[in-house]
Amino acid sequence: MARVKRGVIARARHKKVLKQAKGYYGARSRVYRVAVQAVTKAGQYAYRDRRNKKRQFRQLWIVRINAAARQNGLSYSRFINGLKKASIEIDRKILADIAVHDQNGFAALVEKAKGAL
């Protein structure tokens, strides 16, 4: 059997991890052993927060829709119920965008929702 020396592979792996840790503070960006831990933890946070981002944006949209609906004299839950009864299928992302950028259009939606209740 031929002897296998892993210097090139180990160096490449170290370089890869240290490149991923670029910009981290102190030893986290310089020391391989610490950088591995930092990069692994960063990956866990990224994985978790890609899922949390969806929840947080939905919460934000609901807050914006609720605020705009209450300005027009209707609570969020009654507004959504009215839209469903009026068979208006607009998702919360678009409703929030309309609420922020087109108050008159949102007021018209609120009136349709009130009429359907």
UniProtKB/Swiss-Prot annotation:
HAMAP family linked: Ribosomal_bL20
Gene Ontology MF terms in the entry: rRNA binding; structural constituent of ribosome
Signal peptide positions (record): none
SUPFAM superfamilies registered for this protein in UniProt: Ribosomal protein L20
Phylogenetic lineage: Bacteria, Pseudomonadati, Pseudomonadota, Gammaproteobacteria, Alteromonadales
Keyword field contains Glycosyltransferase: no
Function: Binds directly to 23S ribosomal RNA and is necessary for the in vitro assembly process of the 50S ribosomal subunit. It is not involved in the protein synthesizing functions of that subunit.
UniProt xrefs under InterPro entries: Ribosomal_bL20, RIBOSOMAL_L20_CS, Ribosomal_protein_bL20_C
Entry's family note: Belongs to the bacterial ribosomal protein bL20 family.
Keyword terms of this UniProt record: Ribonucleoprotein, Ribosomal protein, RNA-binding, rRNA-binding
UniProt-listed Pfam families: Ribosomal_L20 (PF00453)
GO biological process, one term: translation
Protein name, as recorded: Large ribosomal subunit protein bL20
CDD domains: Ribosomal_L20
Gene Ontology annotations for the cellular component aspect, listed alphabetically: ribonucleoprotein complex; ribosome
Organism: Idiomarina loihiensis (strain ATCC BAA-735 / DSM 15497 / L2-TR)
